[in-house]
Amino acid sequence: MTTVARVARGGWDVESASTPIANRARIEQVETNVDAPTTPEMLFDSALELRHESGVALRFEAEDALREWVKLGLPAIEVAAAKTWRRSHVERFGDASIAATRDARGGEGVGTSADGADGAALPPGPSMTSWNTTERSAEYDWTFTTPYGGTVTTTSDSNRQPPTWELTDRRIDRAMLTERDPILMYDELTLYESELDDNGVAHLGLKVRVMPKCWFVLLRFWLRVDGVLIRLFETRFFCDFTEVDRTGAVVVVRETQRREETWDALHARGAPCDPTQFPDADQAASVLLAAGGPVDIVTHALTIAP
């Protein structure tokens, strides 16, 4: 059952929809739409949309996030388990590209001698103890890492072009976010998640909060490949209803922080390397922040003319 939350404030109409896991037909449709070889096991049609009275909207959804994953095309992580993971994933969830992969590899694929004499399914992927850097899977980035930063659109009855994100020296007003104002709306959504066949987790989700003077969104992609690396992309969006420039324009600030650490680098700095220490994005963020590793930060502004 779909659960909807909605509030209107400061010229914005904010609406979130939380849905069950998508069915197979919807998953296949997404794979076709974004030209993806597969999708995460848990894919949701949940979405958040923030519509401004000018007709400009900022939307967050799994399909567009996966489209950005395909475009990014990161090289696959070099682990011995990668190919086995992919093939067992295909056995369990399907993969429209398997026929092409089999042909390209001279017949190696599901249902061939590579799987067993009787074409039986492969067992689940190996445990974390088998991860190493001795073999490269060149199929695709099976971690579903996405640089997604939301989708900017305009309503169908608007003749304007969607505004674009521009680099800025503006900052999110964190003091305003800590004020004891009432929370008019709060929601958390999962857009997609994969357990990487018990070898870690990849998760994309968001939190939204609307208050009397502003709204705030935290979009997080986080990845844990056990024994290999931790990756965390955090993108924060903020709009102050009380701030309008001299032209009457409204500004949305987007701050992106990207952190990535190998298991070895964390261990060298004394950080915990037990997967149980990273059960979710909140814990991963705390450990990575405490470890003091490298972080890339960039800030953009979206100016919405009246």
Show which residues each predicted segment covers.
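Anionic, Ser/Thr-rich low-complexity intrinsically disordered regions
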Residues: 2-33, 42-43, 76-144, 148-161, ...
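Short linear, low-complexity motifs centered on an aromatic residue
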Residues: 61-82
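Generic detector of ordered, mature protein regions
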Residues: 20, 25-27, 63, 234, ...
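A eukaryote-biased signal for long
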Residues: 130-306
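Amphipathic, interaction-prone secondary-structure segments
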Residues: 28-65, 207-210
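Intrinsically disordered, low-complexity segments enriched in small/polar residues
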Residues: 8-9, 53, 71, 92, ...
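Residue-level detector of high-confidence beta-strand sites
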Residues: 17, 57-61, 220, 232
